[in-house]
């Protein structure tokens, strides 16, 4: 990115000057960008000031002592309801009146959609422009009533006498009154006239018109505090809050314009998430529905615990329910469904194999039951027999506190040994040195994982039970019930299981503070242990957020100064301003930390704003429902099960660090990038979302991908790393964690220059093609069920005599043609031909059931059920010559047309390998087939027959020998193989060109008289294309690995293709299916038109090393929050979004890709994936 690229080019500047004032004022469009009549602006000003006029009427009557304060508020509200209703009715009438709006001619294409021609001050087109109206009638009524409430309560809120009582200053009253009513007018205008485009946008589409409610919602909040202060007197804190909020009230327009205040839907989910996590001890959830359900259940648990009379009962209830609520809700529902099913089925469940326990998580279930039983027994006994009502520093609880300190130290040390860097700074001396020696590397890593197993035992079994003992011994549980005890201890007993590692840290901090502080201090005297843990939990979370936000801000500032490509003309100015106003910048960081909202760097420059608070997911839609799917998405789809299995081991051992909802990880292998986000965490499980980023690397993508490779290489691939050396890329948002062995597809692309265009290879290709055709057809016929054998059993009727072939009348539509309409023209039969053939044979058998005329034993049946149904009998069908599809010919040419008379095999078993009758009829001249038959490899043909495994009798070798000597069968294969060969290359037996090979490989046939004959037989066509692709792959292998020595080696090679390879095209559905079924190898041929070369692509399924690194979560949230701003106001010299430009330190391009569509464009996004850490 060059330094002179403007953040806002000309048309974006004009757009900003139109859009931003509209956002600030709540909707009035005072700058249109084209000439409009003055009444357009006058009307908007009148509508904007209408609430002030109505509220001013009530205020004036109150100041003149004509009305009481609440009466004046009611009068203003009533007038506003009437006015809003009239405005909405006018809008409905204008929209129902047909009007032709003519566009104004202009050269500014970008602004055309906003330009209209107005005819009168109160015309329909003017009204529709000023007041767009509501989509729903209910909203029309609701918003009108709501506007009246806002106006009435706002009048009451800003009464001069009331404001003077708060501040005692007429000057302050005047200022707050004027600017306060501007705030009210902004809120009213967006509600009843025209809604502004909000910078704080959460949903991509406002389907239910929630956006107009955003500004009135915050007005109601400010008014509610004032009402509470009015009716609840003698509370100094409430009075001070009311004074502060009155000042903030006049600043609301700027907070709305800057996008600091969240929209209602984001505010709801954020508030529920915060209360669930910090007030009730839960975790953010993977879906909004699970979040709401878990919040209701958790809140209900806290309420129920308040009404339990027995202290032992309270302890047991909190322990048991805290454990159950920390489990994966999906697992709990599975156990419930299993129990209901067992109850319904009863003793008859043995008759249903589908209900067997192979799918049920018995191991986890037994573990949970055992741990829950131990926890309940421990908590009940300790609380009843050991716990004392007095606080003591030398009691049993203090001893347990020391034990928890030791456990925390051990668990943290063991966790840090699993990652490449200790605290992300110093290289771990115990981690394997070099990944180049793969086997040695993984052997050493497995030893570390054994240490991780010790950590898992301490963290999953020992620590929760120790913390339950610490809480059960607390003296606060012996006192009378209070709200603080119910909330605090409900959360504490839940956190023990929900997030054991953070709960362990919080408990140790509380225990340590209690030991070192005085018993008379406010912390120990006024707060019980549950509330202390709650406050420590909030401080812990906010401290982590503050540190990561500060790291993010420093990285943005350093990148602007150190990265040459990020230099701009304003670089020095921005750096100086950030240094001078460092306290102000620090205050912004603190504010965003307190609100748990993203720190938004405008255009990823050190111009920081506070983004609006939002849930951890950052996006409103369901996880995994949106992605820009392409042909490469299937690689990530195949990868997900393997990756989750590898992540399960790494997460359980602690290789990925502290697992918290909202954490982001980046995986890298070959040219693929994986984005992993933790959605929720619980006892022995976490839920993740995996996104796959594009493989088609752009220049910006490549620049950041190279930096990612550098970060991982410096960590894992240094030949002689120093002990405890520093992380060389400490300033980067990516910190390497570990390497995972995952079975994935490696992708190799090669240029076939010198192979596919070699004359010698092309000549050998033609000879090999005939051999492969023979092998494919014999293998196909040997594996399919034999219908002829079924048809010839128990026959006692004599067959009709053979009529001369020359007198055969033209036959009706053949059986293959009748089936072609229902046949599946797909690539599924290339490697999976048996099921397709079986289905076709079943259709043939079902159609042949009514037939009573059976063929001569040893002959080829050619009955047509259509003829039978017509009553014509099979007399002429047995010996007909199929010549359909041929062009008209004269008698001289007629004699050269190939026909197949009745075939009589010398071996009775030959019929098992006979080709279908419809394949043997073709339009190829018989003389040409006879001429080309010399190319048929008879020795190879006999060798393939002798290698068949379809006969299992004791006389297998004798039967195969007889079949190999059957001349009729051989002639049948010669005729069909050579006809297919001619169908591929035409009548002229020339050397094919590379372009011709690629065309046939892709499924195209050269134009010839045999084209229709071959293409009209889908099954045969697919087999021929399969043989052609095998032959081309064989040519590439011979050029790379050397020539084939003998027939046995060739057979083994073809069997390997059949068993382990899929050879086809990337665009075929079978290619995707082969990847999902994990075919060991895949091959594809292509042509690179830009370079003019032929290429091959080979995929090999093998265990690969996937590098995993942890991203700065706040850097991700901040850049995602910045996207809406850039979509509105940013651009660059390529007319692209500014944010997709490469930023090697922030990984800006990759971060934008990982955002949910339409802002981002990942090519794959998984559903929430549960990972069981046990």
UniProtKB/Swiss-Prot annotation:
Region (Disordered) residue spans: 785-875
Biased composition (Polar residues): 785-797
Residue ranges with Basic and acidic residues bias: 835-846
Locations listed in the record: Membrane
Residues with glycosylation annotation: 790, 1122, 1149
Membrane topology: Multi-pass membrane protein
Descriptive protein name: Pecanex-like protein 4
């Amino acid at each position: 990115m060059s330094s002179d690229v403007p953040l806002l080019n000309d048309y974006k500047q004009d757009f900003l000057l139109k859009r931003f004032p509209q956002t600030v004022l709540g909707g009035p469009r005072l700058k249109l960008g084209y000439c409009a009549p003055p009444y357009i602006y006058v009307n908007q000003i009148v509508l904007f000031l209408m609430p002030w006029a109505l509220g001013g009427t009530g205020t004036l009557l109150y100041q003149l002592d004509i009305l009481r304060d609440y009466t004046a508020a009611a009068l203003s509200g009533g007038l506003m309801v009437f006015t809003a209703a009239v405005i909405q009715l006018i809008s409905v009438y204008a929209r129902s009146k047909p009007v032709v709006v003519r566009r104004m001619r202009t050269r500014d294409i970008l602004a055309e959609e906003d330009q209209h021609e107005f005819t009168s001050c109160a015309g329909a087109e003017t009204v529709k422009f000023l007041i767009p109206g509501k989509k729903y009638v209910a909203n029309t009524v609701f918003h009108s009533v709501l506007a009246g409430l806002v106006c009435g309560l706002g009048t009451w809120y800003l009464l001069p006498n009331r404001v003077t009582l708060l501040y005692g200053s007429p000057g302050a009253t005047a200022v707050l009154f004027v600017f306060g009513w501007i705030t009210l007018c902004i809120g009213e205008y967006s509600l009843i006239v025209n809604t502004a485009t909000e910078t704080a946008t959460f949903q991509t589409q406002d389907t239910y018109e929630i956006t107009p409610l955003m500004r009135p919602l915050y007005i109601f909040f400010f008014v509610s505090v004032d009402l509470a202060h009015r009716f609840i007197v003698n509370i100094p804190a409430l009075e001070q809050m009311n004074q502060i909020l009155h000042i903030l009230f006049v600043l609301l327009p700027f907070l709305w314009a800057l996008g600091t205040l969240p929209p209602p839907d984001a505010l709801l989910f954020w508030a529920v998430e915060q209360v669930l996590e910090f007030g009730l001890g839960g975790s953010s959830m993977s879906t909004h529905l699970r979040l709401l359900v878990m919040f209701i259940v958790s809140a209900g648990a806290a309420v129920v615990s308040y009404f339990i009379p027995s202290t032992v009962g309270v302890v047991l209830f909190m322990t048991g329910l805290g454990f159950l609520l920390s489990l994966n809700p999906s697992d709990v529902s599975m156990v419930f469904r299993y129990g209901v099913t067992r109850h319904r089925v009863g003793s008859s469940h043995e008759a249903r194999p589908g209900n067997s326990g192979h799918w049920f998580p018995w191991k986890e279930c037994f573990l949970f039951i055992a741990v829950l039983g131990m926890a309940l027994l421990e908590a009940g006994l300790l609380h009843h027999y050991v716990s004392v009502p007095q606080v003591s520093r030398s009691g049993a609880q203090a001893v347990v506190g020391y034990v928890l300190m030791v456990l925390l130290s051990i668990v943290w040390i063991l966790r840090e040994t699993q990652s490449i860097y200790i605290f992300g700074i110093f290289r771990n001396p115990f981690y394997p040195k070099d990944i180049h020696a793969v086997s040695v590397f993984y052997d050493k890593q497995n030893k570390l994982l054994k240490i991780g197993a010790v950590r898992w035992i301490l963290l999953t079994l020992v620590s929760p039970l120790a913390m339950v003992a610490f809480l059960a011994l607390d003296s606060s549980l012996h006192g009378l019930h209070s709200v603080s005890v119910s909330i605090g201890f409900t959360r504490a007993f839940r956190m023990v299981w929900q997030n054991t590692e953070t709960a362990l840290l919080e408990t140790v901090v509380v225990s340590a503070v209690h030991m070192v502080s005085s018993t008379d201090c406010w912390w120990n005297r006024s707060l019980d242990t549950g509330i202390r843990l709650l406050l420590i939990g909030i401080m812990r979370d906010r401290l982590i957020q503050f540190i990561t936000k500060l790291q993010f801000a420093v990285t943005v500032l350093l990148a602007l100064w150190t990265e040459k490509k990020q230099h701009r003309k304003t670089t020095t100015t921005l750096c100086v301003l950030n240094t001078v106003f460092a306290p102000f910048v620090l205050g912004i960081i603190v504010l965003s930390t307190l609100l748990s909202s993203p720190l938004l760097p405008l255009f990823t420059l050190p111009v920081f704003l506070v983004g609006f608070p939002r849930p951890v997911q950052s996006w409103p839609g369901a996880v995994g429902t949106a992605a820009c799917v392409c042909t490469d998405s299937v690689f990530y789809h195949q990868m997900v099960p393997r990756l989750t299995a590898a992540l399960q081991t790494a997460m359980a051992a602690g290789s990925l660090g502290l697992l918290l909802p909202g954490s982001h990880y980046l995986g890298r292998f070959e040219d693929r990038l994986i984005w992993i986000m933790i959605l929720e965490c619980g006892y022995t499980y976490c839920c993740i979302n995996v996104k796959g980023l594009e493989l088609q690397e752009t220049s910006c993508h490549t620049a950041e991908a190279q930096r990612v490779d550098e970060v991982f290489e410096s960590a894992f691939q240094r030949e002689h790393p120093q002990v405890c050396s520093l992380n060389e890329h400490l300033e980067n948002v990516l910190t390497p964690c570990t390497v995972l062995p995952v079975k994935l597809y490696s992708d190799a692309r090669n240029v076939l220059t010198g192979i596919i265009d070699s004359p010698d290879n092309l000549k050998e290709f033609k000879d090999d093609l005939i051999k492969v055709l023979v092998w494919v057809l014999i293998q196909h016929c040997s594996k399919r069920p034999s219908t002829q054998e079924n048809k010839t059993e128990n026959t006692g009727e004599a067959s009709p005599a053979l009529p001369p072939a020359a007198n055969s009348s033209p036959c009706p539509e053949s059986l293959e043609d009748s089936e072609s309409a229902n046949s599946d023209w797909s690539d599924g039969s290339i490697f999976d031909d048996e099921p397709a053939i079986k289905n076709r044979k079943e259709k043939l058998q079902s159609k042949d059931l009514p037939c009573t005329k059976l063929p001569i034993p040893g002959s080829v049946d050619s009955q047509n059920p259509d003829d039978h149904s017509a009553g014509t009998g099979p007399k002429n069908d047995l010996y007909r010559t199929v010549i359909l599809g041929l062009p008209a010919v004269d008698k001289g040419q007629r004699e050269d047309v190939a026909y197949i008379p009745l075939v009589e095999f010398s071996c009775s078993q030959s019929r098992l390998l006979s080709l279908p009758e419809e394949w043997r009829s073709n339009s190829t001249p018989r003389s040409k087939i006879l001429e080309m038959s010399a190319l048929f490899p008879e020795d190879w043909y006999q060798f393939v027959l002798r290698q068949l495994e379809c006969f299992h009798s004791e006389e297998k070798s004798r039967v195969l020998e007889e079949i190999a000597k059957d001349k009729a069968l051989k002639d049948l294969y010669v005729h069909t193989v050579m006809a297919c060969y001619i169908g591929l290359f035409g009548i002229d037996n020339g050397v094919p060109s590379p372009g011709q090979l690629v065309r046939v490989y892709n499924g195209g046939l050269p134009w010839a008289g045999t084209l229709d004959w071959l293409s009209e037989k889908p099954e045969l066509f697919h087999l021929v294309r399969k043989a052609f692709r095998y032959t081309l792959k064989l040519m590439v292998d011979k050029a790379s690995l050397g020539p084939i020595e003998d027939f046995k080696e060739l057979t083994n090679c073809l069997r390997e293709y059949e068993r382990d390879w899929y050879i086809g095209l990337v665009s075929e559905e079978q290619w995707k299916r082969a990847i999902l079924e994990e075919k060991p190898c895949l091959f594809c041929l292509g042509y690179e038109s830009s370079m003019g070369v032929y290429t091959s692509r080979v995929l090999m399924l093998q265990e690969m090393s996937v590098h995993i690194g942890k991203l700065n979560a706040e850097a991700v949230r901040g850049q995602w929050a910045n996207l809406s701003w850039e979509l509105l106001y940013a651009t660059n010299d390529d007319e692209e979004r500014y944010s997709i430009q490469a930023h090697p330190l922030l990984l800006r391009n990759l971060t934008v890709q990982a955002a949910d569509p339409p802002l981002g464009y990942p090519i794959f996004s998984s559903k929430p994936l549960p990972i069981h850490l046990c």
